[in-house]
Structure formats: C-alpha cells, structure tokens
C-alpha cells in the first residue's frame, strides 16, 4: 500500500473460517469489480478497446482488398499480365489472412476458463502464424508459375493497362498502410497515468503475486489495488512449522484520476507496441505496395518496349522473394512468444542486477520473464533478503522497480530470508 494514500480499504465481502483441530485461520476479502487481465479478459475495457480498434481497421482493409482484387483480376486478364494476376492472388490471401486476424481478435476476448486461466490471448499469435504461412504458400505458387512462363513463352502483355492497374493498386495500398500503420505504437506519458488502449500500455490492470517468508512462518494471500483497496486476503497460520509464507495477487485497479504521479514518467519510456494481427496485416499491405511499385515499373518498361515482356515475370520472382523477407521478423516474434523466450525489449540481466543492487537484497534467483502475447509480459522470481529487512517494504520496492522500469503487467515475487 502506498504511504501517501490514506483512503481506507473498501471490502465487499469477508469470510473467515477457523479450525481448532488444525489451528489454521483462513479469510477471504474480495474487492468489488476486481478483474484480472488474464483470467477475465472480457472485463478488461482496455483490451476490449484495443480489439475493437484493431477489428475496425481490419474490416476496412478487407473491404478495400476485395474492391481492388476485383479490379486487378479484370485488368490482369485484359493485360495478360501474370504480375497483376499474382498480385490479385496475393490480395486474396490478404483477405483470408485478415479474416483469420479478425477471428483471432474476436476469440481473444473470450472469458477465461479453469483450463485456460490466462484467457485466449495467444489465439492472436496463432492467427498471425497462419496468416504468414498463407503468404509463404502463395509466394511459392507465384514463383512456380513465373518459372513456367519463363520456360514457355507467354503471349503479349499490355504495358499501359498493366501500369494503370498497378498504379491504382499502389494508391489503395497506401491508404491501407496508413490505416494499419497508424496504430499508436508509440508510448504516451499522461500525468494522470490512467489506462488508455491505443495499442500501448498506460497502466491498465496489473497483477502481482507476492510471497514472503519470515520467522513466524504464516501463509498470506493479499490483493490490493492502486489506491490501497484490499482485493483478496487469505491467511493461513501453521504453528510449529517454522515457516511464514506471504502470497499476494494484486490487480492494481486504476481510476481515471488520482493515480500515483510517479508512474507517469515510466509511461514515457514504454516500448512501442501494436496488435500483432494488425502488424501482420500491415506486412501484407507492405508486400503488396512493394509489388505494385515493381509492377508499375515493369508495366512502364513494357509499355515503352513491348518486346521486353519478360520483365513481367522477373517482377513476379523478385517481389515474391521480397514479400517472404518482410515476414521474417514477425515470424521470429511469434516463435519467441510460443517458446516463452524473454521479450527482446526487456534486458533480463539488467533487471536482475537492478534488483540485487537494492538495499536489503541478498540474491535473486529463479527469474523467469515471458509473454502470453505481444505486449502482455509476465515475470516470476525469488528474492532473498537480509534478516533485518522488512519483507513488506522490500516487496513494495521490488514490485515498484519492476513496474516503473520495465512495465511488466503480471508479477510474481517470492520473498525469502537468507
């Protein structure tokens, strides 16, 4: 609980059970409206707004793709241009990929279940993976068709129509790139620190699990919001075991005002983040734009010299390879999430050293940092403190450091005595 916050705890329900045979006391306090970003995603207004904004962009992109695809199919047939037809096929894969992304965003809002305690956020990762595989499959088909046409001479190509259709395609792709790329991937530092949802974190719901061990050897679960309001408390006392364990799970419920002003500075340092499905769609559009430019250049050359129709096939080969390379980074990010690697924007060594440099901290071990999906990072570790250190104060310092410096939304800390 913050020292500057004098607001009394607000407790909606208290249950206490005492067993004389086991000398164990258990109590539960549940805060009104407490919701976990991972366990109950449908109650997270921040994630809901993120999904809705992303879905609107993808729906507009699908409509534009369908319109332009129809234009390219007609224009490609009339111009006898494989490059235009393959671009139309690429747009078809875009439509399918966007549809997968839309489904992924919708499914990510499903309420968590006992089996899926973190919700369905990772469906977004799987949807983006399928989307990328569609690009690779189509690129392989296009390369094969281009090679066949190189071996077997194709008919005449109308360079003027090829140029006009690809120019129109470039215009449509620019519109979609602006739409999908302007996803507020930059961090904002609002002084009030309340949660915004433009695909960048502003301190929405944070979750902490705290574990203390001291000489009394009890077991405590404590939930507390950002204003000092108790969320959940379970107290178990085990005499004779010589072990005190404090476990706290703490969603920090931010209101629209009155949040800790010291957190606003940390918001300025947050890494850029955008929804992975919107970013995947952006890569699709980027590949289409590059291909449209190539087709425009090829069309202009063929328009000027019709006998150089082989350029149509060369464009198909070159830009199919470029499209493949545009997906490498996204695929790497997807695999890192699925492999539960430490996110690249977080320096685990620096974080660990920062904890060890704190007064009262003896050692840090069992440090694990991973992500459920892009932008939703989790951390768990054991922190050993000196005998004379106050466990609660040390816990607050550790949690505050991790949140302010690294913006990790779900933290589990176990405090141990040396």
From Swiss-Prot:
Residues 235-245 have a biased composition (Basic residues). Keywords: Ion transport, Membrane, Transmembrane, Transmembrane helix, Transport, Vacuole, Zinc, Zinc transport. Residues 186-248 are annotated as: Disordered. The keyword Acetylation does not apply. Its main location: membrane. It comes from the Eukaryota. Residues 78-89, 144-160, 304-307 are vacuolar. It is found in: Vacuole membrane. One of its GO terms (biological process) is zinc ion transmembrane transport. It is a multi-pass membrane protein. One of its GO terms (molecular function) is zinc ion transmembrane transporter activity. SUPFAM superfamilies: Cation efflux protein cytoplasmic domain-like, Cation efflux protein transmembrane domain-like. GO terms for cellular component: plant-type vacuole; plasma membrane; vacuolar membrane; vacuole. Residues 1-56, 111-122, 182-282, 329-418 are cytoplasmic. Residues 196-227 have a biased composition (Basic and acidic residues). Residues 182-246 are annotated as: Required for zinc-binding. The chain crosses the membrane at residues 57-77, 90-110, 123-143, 161-181, 283-303, 308-328. It holds the Pfam family Cation_efflux. Involved in sequestration of excess zinc in the cytoplasm into vacuoles to maintain zinc homeostasis. PANTHER family: CATION EFFLUX PROTEIN/ ZINC TRANSPORTER (PTHR11562), METAL TOLERANCE PROTEIN A2 (PTHR11562:SF100). Belongs to the cation diffusion facilitator (CDF) transporter (TC 2.A.4) family. SLC30A subfamily. This is Metal tolerance protein 1. It comes from Oryza sativa subsp. japonica. The lineage of its organism: Eukaryota, Viridiplantae, Streptophyta, Embryophyta, Tracheophyta.
